[in-house]
Amino acid sequence: MSVKYIFVTGGVVSGLGKGITAASLGRLLKARGVHVTIQKFDPYINVDPGTMSPYQHGEVFVTEDGAETDLDLGHYERFIDENLSKNSNITTGKIYWSVISKERKGDYLGGTVQVIPHITNEIKDRIYRVGKSERTDVVITEIGGTVGDIESLPFLESIRQVSNEVGRENVMYIHVTLVPYLGISGELKTKPTQHSVKELRSIGIQPDVIVCRTEKYLSQDMKEKLSLFCNVPEGAVVQNLDAEVLYEVPLMLEKEGLAKIVCKRLGLECKEPDLDEWEEMVRRQKNPKSSVTIGLVGKYVELHDAYLSVAESLRHGGIGNDVEVDIRWVNSEEIENGEVNSFLQGVDGILVPGGFGDRGIEGKINAITFARENKIPFFGICLGMQMAVVEFARNVAGLHDANSSEFGETPYPVIDLMPEQREVDEMGGTMRLGVYPCKINENTLIKGIFEDELIYERHRHRYEFNNEFRDTFIKNGMTLSGLSPSGKLVETIELKDHPWFVGVQFHPEFKSRPNKPHPLFKDFVRAAYEYKTK
């Protein structure tokens, strides 16, 4: 059977949830025995989001093979429960970089390099490459941005050409659009969707399905109107209401018949969907037996998407324990002067996630001190682990001016730049990225959580525990519970005299799934609930 291609575009406004729609469709097709992979094209000129501000872009999601990608890839992996690769996130910057490099090598034989055909051919090559490199029946491709944006035009032209090259029977276009509700008149308005589809058709793409994001139910008359003006079958107008919980969206789209429409349109051999596990997971999330409050201490907390995978992983841990996780977002800058108690009083656990730069660092250290002294479950990730090391050095080991060398001169650089990073000049894509093994020591909390001796986790860092201080930390009560197989890199730390105090250099949030919570997040939430009920 030929590989099938589904393209998901967006109209009217950005932020409608194209990524969630694509991921949900992937889950529904996988439930029918279809092998699915997903990719996203982003129209910005950055090569990847690795050097972009979290305030502009949200979190950077890291794949197994070390690609720094859009946060939507996190949604894709969590929904379809598959590991994606660097081929799954392509930017305008990557496309132009590749084309210009080929031109410099003389690959175009002296021809004039143009958007059509050279840029569009490069885009199509990235689409086909995923279909060839992955064992897949269907490639779902999300086109970032909004129809009508000048930046998206080469991508839209490329996906138009794909249908000519592989056959219209092997291609499907899904357009996600907004049907706004005007409270003053009590009406849903279809005109924005009509104009968005008109714009899409003007460049040669006729959508096969329109997914309507709306806060109110679409009436049958409304669906008939959209069908008429947008030239799609009436049954292909799918409503996508606001969901109570994120992972309910696939079930809502299943009721709307989206996957059946896709299977019929593309001629896919689909079995009856097996969504029992997913339905049970959603039921558990919507009906918790209790709740815990986790204080998430970071410097980008105004934009929750900056910590999207961490927040979702906490919720996964909650599902695994049948408790609801309420996240208390704490700006680390606001607790730099010692006002910790008023911000963290009453929390059942404290999590300090990853990050870069010295802004808000002292607030994170204050939060860690609060967790350590009050025996509150603590979880430090990447920079969070590093700051736990600094806090311990200052307040337990007697190294009062200890710090990370990332933040300036210090007599005790307990966190230091990795040796292989010392000669690196460029910022983008040069960190220790992707999956690396970690060997867990016996008789440790981490060993009890994982059971396995060797685990594989994703990383994104330049700095590490300074081995010159190992003996000092061990002597003062810190356990270095996980190391790289060579024994050179400290991967995990914990405290002997604390019920649950764990720091990890890696990013476990990138491997957590709603139906398969990461063991660390699941046990952290368990410990938080135990702390609450003791």
Swiss-Prot record:
UTP binds at S14, K189, T190, K191, P192, T193, Q194, K225. InterPro entries: Class_I_gatase-like, CTP_synthase, CTP_synthase_N, GATASE, GATase1_CTP_Synthase, P-loop_NTPase. The active site is at C382 (nucleophile), H507, E509. Coiled coil: none annotated. One of its GO terms (biological process) is pyrimidine nucleobase biosynthetic process. Residues 1-268 are annotated as: Amidoligase domain. L-glutamine binds at Y55, G355, L383, G384, M385, Q386, E406, R462. Residues 293-534 form the Glutamine amidotransferase type-1 domain. CTPSs have evolved a hybrid strategy for distinguishing between UTP and CTP. The overlapping regions of the product feedback inhibitory and substrate sites recognize a common feature in both compounds, the triphosphate moiety. To differentiate isosteric substrate and product pyrimidine rings, an additional pocket far from the expected kinase/ligase catalytic site, specifically recognizes the cytosine and ribose portions of the product inhibitor. ATP binds at G15, L16, G17, K18, G19, I20, D72. This is CTP synthase. GO terms for molecular function: ATP binding; CTP synthase activity; glutaminase activity; identical protein binding; metal ion binding. CTP binds at S14, D149, I150, E151, K189, T190, K191, P192, T193, Q194, K225. Allosterically activated by GTP, when glutamine is the substrate; GTP has no effect on the reaction when ammonia is the substrate. The allosteric effector GTP functions by stabilizing the protein conformation that binds the tetrahedral intermediate(s) formed during glutamine hydrolysis. Inhibited by the product CTP, via allosteric rather than competitive inhibition. Keywords: ATP-binding, Glutamine amidotransferase, Ligase, Magnesium, Metal-binding, Nucleotide-binding, Pyrimidine biosynthesis. One of its GO terms (cellular component) is cytosol. Mg(2+) binds at D72, E142. Pathway: Pyrimidine metabolism; CTP biosynthesis via de novo pathway; CTP from UDP: step 2/2. It catalyses: UTP + L-glutamine + ATP + H2O = CTP + L-glutamate + ADP + phosphate + 2 H(+); L-glutamine + H2O = L-glutamate + NH4(+); UTP + NH4(+) + ATP = CTP + ADP + phosphate + 2 H(+). It comes from Ruminiclostridium cellulolyticum (strain ATCC 35319 / DSM 5812 / JCM 6584 / H10).
